Amino acid sequence: MKTPRPRLAGAMLASAFTFNAFACGFCIEDKIAAVYDHAVAIRAVAQRHQVAFFAVEGNIPPGEGSRRAIEAIAESLVGVDEGSARVSVASASLSVAFDPARVPAEDLEIQLGRKLAGKGLTVGIMRIMDKPSELKVTGKR
């Protein structure tokens, strides 16, 4: 009788590499890039606002409906700039521009988490963009 140990060992090894891939800095950069909108970032910095990038955990149904629903939830929060929410269902990430004088980033994360909990989703801040230097363009055009 065959034992499933070699398959189990292989599955465990594969899952270890998968976990490390999700936790790597490059993957975070990919998630941020998927929801980065330069026009939103420029406008936010000009208004002394910030841009928050969130990882979204949970089962997000694919499609435009999910994207629009999450964007609407994000934009309904106090302090979030209207029209600034960007969602990537494929990369499970979200960005919003917000006024830190009206809502600190940590409170924004809590409020967003509460609103998305009903959909079985949680969020975690990946990065906050708050300095014009982060938008510096280098090289010749």
Regions found by a protein language model. Give the residues of each.
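Cleaved targeting-peptide boundary
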Residues: F22-K31
